Amino acid sequence: SRTGNRKKQSRTSNQKNGYALKLEQSYGGARDNTVTIKNSGSKQSVLTSSGYQITTSSGDSNYTQIVNLEGDIVLKNLDETKEPLGIKLGTGSKLLDTESARNLIPNGGFSVKEADGNKYIYGSYANAAGKAADGNITLLHDYKGNEPINSGSKSAALDLDGHTYTYTGKTAAINVNYPNVEFTVKNGKVVATDETTDGAHLIGAPNESNMNNRSLTLDGVELTVPGDVCGIITNGTETGNKVTLKNSTLNVENGFGIYFPSSGKVTIDNSVINAKHAGVQVCSGSLTIVGETAITVTGQPQEKTDADGPIADGAAVSIVNRDGYKKLETVNIENGVFNSAADVEAVRAYSFNNADKTENEWSEAGNVVEVTGGSFSSNIAENIVNSDMQATTTSGGETRFVVGKTAVENAIQALKSGDKITFKKVADDAVITVPENVEITNSTGKDITVNGDTFEVGETTTAHVWDTEYTIDKEATCTEDGSKSIHCTTPGCTAKKDVQIIPAAHKLENVAEQQATCKAEGIKAHQHCTVCGKDFIDGVEKTVDELKITKLAHTYVDGKCTVCGESDSNYNPGTMNPEQMIPSQPNDTNKPDNRMDNPETGDGSNLTLPIIILSVSGIGLSGIFIYLRKRKCNR
């Protein structure tokens, strides 16, 4: 171990691309060592240069140099307008990972956790990958330089952590350079600057006998290469290779997206490929495309002049049955948006003769390729399509061929007034709702239902959008039926359906019974129509007279009604009413006296009381009735 104590001291190099402090061992003198750069003073130490401020190296990758910085040490660029380059961690050199140490590695820096439990920072991915105990490496800062991302001999994952890795070299930005390795790059951007540089290689060295079983996964990565090259490429002589594009974007706007001639598997999941000559081309192995994938190819087909390498056929997805290549397994296109240039098939499946460099029909394509979903810029060969939902849409002058339930539903939702859709196949259980004023053609060979309407085979018409509630077209009256129907909601459209009769009917109100009295007639309980004025009982029309309840008789006492007080016009005060007859019993102590006070009259004469005694011989006295008759006397 060595300690450099720079107490109260700063160092400056005025040389072009010079360094302030060099801690490098020669190859012959290489050994494991620890170097500590320490400022034990109270004042800040400053290391200034135009190149790296500190350079380090163990001299041999078989040996390790651990670099520590302690105290207040600042790195500066000789040109104050530029950021310092920091520490250059060379071969076998690493820096204990601390927050302050990370700031000393402004260009890149790769952090790993090693077997001793500590985290260290390396200057290159290759050095870091060989030491990572758990296979996880994290990029600390944006990187720009000529060192590619080489996987190394161990399976690992590089987390770009939102940073950009800019490769200025001329081979490939990413290289899975060992067999039996699974390598993942995630969460960031990888950019190649040279037009001769491929994006990623899974290609063995020419003298390597076994470079099989290599895997590359890009997860959440945007990989961009500028030239007429390949975004990702494998070797046709190898087996068991895997390429996975997940939530990623591959930009090769002047070249090929993915060229996969080796056996193995390609998976494109919810990713974007932008290319010129072909989006993804497989000549062996298998291919699966799922999720919201979008592949766009802008170029026209080009004549093939050599027997090897990718074919510029202009297809978004290209499946080539090629002489001398390993067997094609299965190709499944389940969803996505696939675009090729005008008059170029978006999905092509064909045979290619390497000898005469010609394309031929591939009769077995339907046994290998299956398209079950997606939206395509061109029609797809019937022998490779397998879906009971197929349609063609025309919108804004662009025609698309849509396959699969999800893709057809998405295409319908995107339609606008004036657009067109032709249904080629419709599942029996499909529920189809098309926006208003869209022209619909039924080319399915059977009747279909759209927006609740039946469309016959071959019929072309504009789709109605029906209201969810009935509209009253004619009000019913007491004597005439009315009608209601479902109307089309499209402005200016007068179409209607499901017309229903509203039966003629009275608008009845219940009228309660009015009981009869001795003064007025009553009215029976009934129903009264507020429109026509007619009255009904139990649905039978009644006249006014039929509703009447006869008046009750008066109950008179002493010439007056005990209910309403009305006088009896027939009442004669001099006549004994039957009600005034009071029967007398022999022992009735309450019987009236035989005498009545005689009221005085004007002439002073007396009232005489006649007494009549009736007797029945042999039977005895059976009763005595006393009749009192008042006689008016004058005083």
Outline where the language-model segments fall.
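Low-complexity, Pro/Thr/Ser/Gly/Ala-rich linker/spacer regions in secreted
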Residues: 100-113, 402-411, 454-466, 499-507, ...
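C-terminal low-complexity, Ser/Thr- and acidic/Pro-rich disordered "stalk" regions positioned immediately N-terminal
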Residues: 555-604
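C-terminal membrane-anchoring or membrane-association module
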Residues: 616-635
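Acidic Gly/Asp/Thr-rich repetitive segments characteristic of extracellular carbohydrate-active
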Residues: 109-140, 397-424
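Surface-exposed loop/turn motifs in large extracellular/passenger domains
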Residues: 1-83, 89-107, 134, 150-159, ...
